[in-house]
């Protein structure tokens, strides 16, 4: 076995990443690769120490529409981007037993689909955001049910999600 694909619920990723990377296996892990930056730093360090590759599976970048958008932006036909707006959503019937509404199972809109929207705008921004402001609406279980995010960078680009 050369590579391990992790597609379990988000809250279990780090435990499987630790085992796979420590065993010297390359890993492709579904989004969100980890729950926070500390876990991600740990996973990256393990990959480096064991000389293996670690990658996050993000389907949107392989969809034809995203590839076409990338081509158009890269061509310069639109000029420099100043504002990027991304709306991404899904409807889930509220059910406090569903993993999407369960804090212990890393539920919430941002970890489930918000990563797609944030990855999209980051793909097109020239540099890392220097400022990020957000507002969320919490479900009764405490997970984020809705979110709005504003990102800006040193080039003056702005993105809304």
Per-region residue spans from a language model:
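Beta-loop-alpha module in the N-terminal Rossmann-like domain of NAD(P)-dependent dehydrogenases
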Residues: 1-46
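Alpha-helical elements of Rossmann-like donor-binding domains used by nucleotide-donor carbohydrate transfer enzymes
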Residues: 3, 15, 42, 64, ...
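Structured beta->alpha junctions
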Residues: 9, 32, 39, 58-61, ...
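A short helix->loop->beta-strand "cap" motif at the edges of active sites that frequently abuts
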Residues: 23-25, 50-53, 156-158
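Rossmann-fold dehydrogenase core element
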Residues: 41-59, 80-84
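Predominantly a Rossmann-like dinucleotide-binding segment in NAD(P)-dependent oxidoreductases
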Residues: 60-132, 140
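Contiguous beta-strand/loop segments that form the cofactor/metal-binding neighborhood of enzyme cores
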Residues: 119-161
